[in-house]
Amino acid sequence: MEEKDNLQLPENAFRELKDGEEYKPLMSPDKVYPEVNGWSVTWGIVMAVIFSAAAAYLGLKVGQVFEAAISIAIIAVGVSTATKRSKALGENVIIQSIGACSGAVVAGAIFTLPAIYILQAKYPEMTTSFMKIFMASALGGVLGILFLIPFRKYFVSDMHGKYPFPEATATTQVLVSGAKGGDQAKPLLIAGLVGGLYDFIVASLGWWNENFTSRVVSLGCDLADKAKLVFKVNTGAAVLGLGYIIGLKYAFFTCLGSLVVWWLIVPGMSVIFHDSVLSAWDPSIVKTVGAMSPEEIFRAYARSIGIGGIAMAGIIGIIKSWGIIKSAVGLAAKELKGKSDVDENVKRTQRDISFKIIAIGSLVTILITFLFFWFGVMDGNLLFAIIAILLVAAIAFLFTTVAANAIAIVGSNPVSGMTLMTLIFASVVMVAVGLKGPGGMLAALIMGGVVCTALSVAGSFITDLKIGYWLGTTPKKQEGWKFLGTLVSAATVGGVMMLLNETYGFASGSLAAPQANAMAAVIDPLMNGVGAPWVLYGIGAVIAIVLTYFKIPALAFALGMFIPLELNVPLLVGGAINWYVTSRSKDAKVNSERGEKGTLIASGFIAGGALMGVVSALLKFGGIEVSIADSWWVNPMSEVCSLLAYICLIGFFIRATKK
């Protein structure tokens, strides 16, 4: 490894490579470095347990799941520095890779499986157990890893510089800056402190509102009530940093998708269906569209257009990626026949688990999943189990590339949207073959849990592999030990979920679990003969097709339609800062240096925000309530303070890139 003073990512780390140009990672492919050992595996398991428990609690109690990768990277760097371990970069990547299973498995599990407990209040005959939750999460996670590995080279190497990989960028900068030490890590450390303190003040103390909205003035309230027009921006440091790393291009199209939904579709629906109660696919809706708030119209109707857009963008992505899928399967078939290249001829940094093992592992996992469905979920009905495994395996495999693509573009996996589509499709198919009622709901939710975890883990894992590619770790080692992290995280989340149900009860309203509540609301009518919002899904699908025809990134646009407005606008603000700091000088070298400095600052904001998310969760878990948000945030002045703080944060960001 290079000396600490010279330790930095190559100049071509974040841009497309020229013809004949090669990317050379920090750790030379021709040398061997400490990666997998007792230290890294033990710390990885500890991180997986701690962050799985914290993420599960936070996600179920207050409806927010934080990304654990950056926080784990910071802790790994801190521990290795405190113990003065030399050449710890490879070890830290393994710690991060094992530990990061936590957020991915948690997201996959809590988006679907708590819906079983929620529906139990209405259908007492629906039962579940720790083993069912663990099996659904673990099998889904293992499938996600196995299905992603064949696409590693395409996403991290072949497409180098074409995708921003925001979370991977931030985590990599944390690991590199930690390995550097001294003044070279200073910008990231300062930005981490500023971003962390800023987000802690908002999340834990509530000194100013987390969002600035047009409702801050009476005219804005009137526009929201009558015209259903609203503007919202999340003023957090972490989301601003995310926007900077994504860049202006993808941030623009994501925000544009959001504005089309919030400023055209939502007001348009209010005008067209003002006095109508549109409850054909959701009997719980009793309000007319005109009586709803913009947020209610978005949740009840407009977001479904985004789901349709994501699904169609995913299908288009599968079609476009068909050559890659075909070559990956072909390579596996070739190796199974014993015609593969000798593993020793492949560079260490390009060495994956053999396709023979992946193919056999995939078949064995699918077989175990089939047996789990047959005896554990379908009560011995062979037909239902066969149809279930065919649906789960096909959807999980095909949408793996979509999940990885979304993470590579915006750092946000639309897993809840894809899972909702899976649930709807699975429910329609299972009803058609005769599986209805509570038994059908349980089966569809377990199937959804497997798919959701598979896609969540696949999306998260591509981040780990990109980090390894930039730094020069061995993919084969990351891949092998990822399975351990998945099993540990699945066991932890299963235990936490059952504990929270016993303590609070999912049906009591004490646990937010918004995604699981949405799944329960969708699946209940479907399994009882009520239709899905196919028209809205169809509109979203048509929009995605039109966008693709005009060469506009359909997935980024559809993500914008699905993700709330307040989380998309700051992406545009961050992207605009990126454009500004990298273009305001006539000297290209100065622009490049400022851009790199900005990436460090943005990474610090993301890292600080993520770490404070964990601290806030621990405070809430311990019953420590110091926030004044409940009483203060109803006052419009809290939003004025929010805007002023945001302007100061942006000013700090831009000024810091000049130093």
Locations of the language-model features?
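Alpha-helical multipass membrane-protein architecture
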Residues: 1-659
